[in-house]
């Protein structure tokens, strides 16, 4: 049985792409000695399948079952929910998407959400039910939730489970945990971080995985609500070159992965970043393909970005 089980959704029912947040948190927790099962593709999990997984994975040692809300439906101010969002093409133009049933994400925005929490507690009443992800703030008031993590949670989840497991002194936790929502404690350094997938994730060579090169953006745009903007020193928010190389090589050697979506807020926010990624790509024994967010207006004033993007392997923006 696992210490912690994390459920992650997918951007779109037709893409079969995994969200990366649950795997980033899972990697961090494993590095601190916890056994973690990450379950992907929640769009294809209903309450019956969820119950099967819980029966197989939850035991007396299980500290928590968590859910990533990033690709869950939007909860609207009037209490209703919407699945029709631009990030989910299969649902964007499908009016029937509002009535999709029998899936974990849709049930989370409906009247049957407590069935999932009740199932967890029927196996182990002491197991905590937690939420994280980009839409966690929308789901704070769900009945049956023990704790909600807001923001980048690497440091907070480790402190939380260290307290629950007895590794550190017991703490009284607020329902909303956001004391280090930018993950900036001195004890942790994003630049050394990676995502390491387990064999039980069954990564296929044809998959497109998600990749962080940097966390944050050097610009401070008025319209942007992302938390880590306005960073002037690129050395503070870019992964170390060797760390990025090792992550790409691990996925290539273990799974044959060569396609990635780069999830940086603005991939071309500096020439230095592109040059660093090109150095990494030049060392690889394979030719990767990347998708990313680029600002075209920056390219106009930095024409060298065109050739750098081509050399790196940017296929689509």
Question: Predicted regions span which residues?
Answer:
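Radical SAM [4Fe-4S] cluster-binding motif and immediate context
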Residues: 186-317
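A general structural detector for well-ordered alpha-helical segments in enzyme core domains, enriched
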Residues: 25, 53, 112-120, 244-247, ...
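Residue-level recognition of beta-strand->loop/alpha-helix junctions
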Residues: 8, 39-43, 228
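Hydrophobic anchor at the start of a short beta-strand
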Residues: 4, 35-37, 127-129, 260, ...
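Structural motif
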Residues: 3, 63-66, 259-261, 316
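N-terminal [4Fe-4S]-dependent radical SAM core
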Residues: 4-5, 11, 162-213
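Glycine-rich beta-alpha loop elements in corrinoid/cobalamin-binding modules
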Residues: 21, 28, 37-185
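Nucleotide-activated donor-dependent transferases that construct or modify glycoconjugates
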Residues: 3-13, 65, 70
């Amino acid at each position: 049985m696992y210490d912690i089980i994390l459920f992650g959704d997918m951007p779109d029912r037709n893409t079969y792409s995994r969200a990366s947040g649950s795997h980033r948190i899972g990697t961090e927790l494993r590095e601190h000695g916890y056994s973690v099962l990450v379950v992907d593709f929640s769009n294809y999990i209903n309450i019956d399948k969820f119950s099967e997984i819980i029966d197989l994975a939850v035991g007396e040692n299980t500290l928590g079952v968590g859910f990533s809300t990033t690709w869950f439906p939007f909860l609207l101010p009037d209490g209703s929910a919407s699945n029709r969002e631009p990030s989910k093409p299969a649902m964007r133009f499908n009016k029937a998407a509002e009535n999709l049933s029998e899936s974990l994400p849709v049930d989370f925005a409906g009247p049957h959400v407590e069935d999932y929490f009740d199932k967890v507690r029927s196996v182990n009443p002491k197991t905590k039910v937690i939420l994280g992800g980009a839409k966690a703030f929308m789901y704070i008031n769900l009945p049956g939730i023990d704790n909600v993590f807001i923001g980048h949670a690497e440091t907070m989840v480790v402190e939380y489970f260290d307290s629950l497991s007895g590794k550190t002194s017991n703490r009284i936790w607020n329902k909303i945990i956001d004391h280090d929502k930018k993950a900036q404690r001195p004890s942790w350094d994003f630049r050394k971080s990676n995502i390491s997938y387990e064999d039980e994730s069954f990564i296929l060579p044809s998959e497109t995985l998600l990749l962080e090169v940097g966390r944050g953006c050097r610009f401070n745009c008025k319209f942007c609500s992302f938390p880590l903007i306005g960073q002037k020193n690129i050395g503070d928010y870019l992964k170390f070159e060797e760390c990025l190389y090792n992550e790409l090589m691990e996925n290539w050697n273990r799974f044959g992965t060569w396609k990635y979506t780069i999830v940086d807020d603005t991939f071309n926010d500096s020439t230095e970043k592109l040059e660093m990624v090109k150095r990494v790509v030049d060392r690889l024994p394979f030719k990767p393909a990347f998708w990313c967010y680029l600002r075209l207006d920056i390219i106009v004033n930095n024409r060298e970005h065109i050739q750098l993007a081509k050399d790196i392997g940017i296929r689509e923006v």
